[in-house]
Amino acid sequence: MRALVLAAGKGTRMKSKIPKVLHPLSGKPMIEWVVETAGKVAQKVGVVLGFEAELVRKTLPEWVDVFVQEEQLGTAHAVMCAKDFIEPGDDVLILYGDVPLISENTLKRMIEEHRKGADVTILVADLEDPSGYGRVIQDGDKYRIIEDADLPEELKSVTTINTGFYVFSGDFLLRVLPEIKNENAKGEYYLTDAVNFAEKVRVVKTDDLLEITGVNTRKTLVWLEEQLRMRKIEELLENGVTILDPATTYIHYSVEIGMDTVIHPMTFIEGRTRVGENCEIGPMTRIVDCEIGNNVKITRSECFKSVIEDDVSVGPFARLREGTILKKSSKIGNFVEIKKSTIGEGTKAQHLSYIGDAFVGKNVNIGAGTITCNYDGKKKNPTFIEDGAFIGSNSSLVAPVRIGEGALIGAGSVITEDVPPYSLGLGRARQVVKEGWVLKKRKEE
């Protein structure tokens, strides 16, 4: 089985300089949805590109065969541009880059039905209002497709529409492609004409209208996003996740969340995030591409491409940047920013700190206002803080530097040299007190 994805259109009605198939749906480009699904049912996947072909090509996996339709002259013409992809002894599935939610199950049903002996298998659906769609007309054992504009009056009551998804026998498709003409109002070559050449046609019906919805406008894309969002939320609710306010909660379809986790309002969980069991997320929190363990609490914070182990507390108003690893039972408090750093088990950074390019051991206390000065104007340098160290408030650790195990840094210090284990590091001027100085100064004035 081969799958050919037609994705050459510009998407004029999207009013965008970005190719239509690259517009994201639930966090990933529409074409990525289709290619991933195609890869689950077909041994080889090809994509026909057109507008901004090179830009779209960059988003595709290396295992996808790419063909280019220089001039968009219809669906059959697009398939003709990929005729080298079609093998006489193999079947080919036709998909569309702007119909992103076609399901693996439906495609498998089509393939199974096709293998009962067919030139072509059509995916159809019944619509209450089929206006604008080509109708699938059955005449005994045969089927044909008539475009809406060409329907005679007596057939306008037919509600079975052609979705545009097909499985073709490779032999049949190669034979009929040269016979398709562009004798229509638009002067284009339509794949529906190939169906009308077929002697053996089989039909599969879908009742899920989401999976056959094509995106031609931003309005449709937003509608599809909302439907997908609510479908995901309902799935999570049914599997033991509490979502206190679905109307203000945005969860991408790729997200996984364990049971007994509570999601508060105004929470955004995106990308390939996995959240464990019995967590509390939000309110007003954004999490992107993170791995989160069990019993984690994150509130009013942002977390990007980070790993958060069990029993960790984050926030409020914390920011975890890419490369952050929070080990078990660590605590990250308000207005703490962490970037490309590992925070050890049981370590606390509770207030007003920046930790960048650092490796922090177990049970370290990082006082309020601590800064790792990691950038020297040319490159980022590492800071090492070993187990059990205590960093006093308002300290600056100028990297590269190492704070030894059990060492103590006095508050207000600027540390530029390594501090050995169990040592006191001070990097500040001695305090001077001049008694009565203020009164003396006033008398002089």
Swiss-Prot record:
Annotated cofactor note: Binds 1 Mg(2+) ion per subunit.
Cofactor(s) in the UniProt record: Mg(2+)
Keyword Cytoplasm carried by entry: yes
GO cellular component, one term: cytoplasm
InterPro entries: Bifunctional_GlmU, GlmU-like, GlmU_C_LbH, Hexapep, Hexapep_transf_CS, MobA-like_NTP_Trfase, Nucleotide-diphossugar_trans, Trimer_LpxA-like_sf
Documented EC number(s): 2.7.7.23, 2.3.1.157
Binding annotation for UDP-N-acetyl-alpha-D-glucosamine: 6-9, 20, 69, 74-75, 96-98, 134, 147, 162, 216, 321, 339, 354, 365
GO molecular function annotations of the record: glucosamine-1-phosphate N-acetyltransferase activity; magnesium ion binding; UDP-N-acetylglucosamine diphosphorylase activity
Gene Ontology biological process terms from the UniProt entry: cell morphogenesis; cell wall organization; lipid A biosynthetic process; peptidoglycan biosynthetic process; regulation of cell shape; UDP-N-acetylglucosamine biosynthetic process
Record's keyword terms, sorted: Acyltransferase, Cell shape, Cell wall biogenesis/degradation, Cytoplasm, Magnesium, Metal-binding, Multifunctional enzyme, Nucleotidyltransferase, Peptidoglycan synthesis, Repeat, Transferase
Superkingdom of source: Bacteria
Sequence positions that bind acetyl-CoA: 368, 374-375, 393, 411, 428
Regions that span the bilayer: none
A family per Pfam: Hexapep
Positions with a binding annotation for Mg(2+): 98, 216
Subcellular localization: Cytoplasm
Catalytic site positions: 351 (proton acceptor)
Database matches in NCBIfam families: glmU, PRK14357.1
Subunit-level organization: Homotrimer.
Family the entry assigns: In the N-terminal section; belongs to the N-acetylglucosamine-1-phosphate uridyltransferase family.
PANTHER family the record matches: BIFUNCTIONAL PROTEIN GLMU, NUCLEOTIDYL TRANSFERASE
Identification of the protein by name: Bifunctional protein GlmU
Organism phylogeny: Bacteria, Thermotogati, Thermotogota, Thermotogae, Thermotogales
This protein's encoding gene: glmU
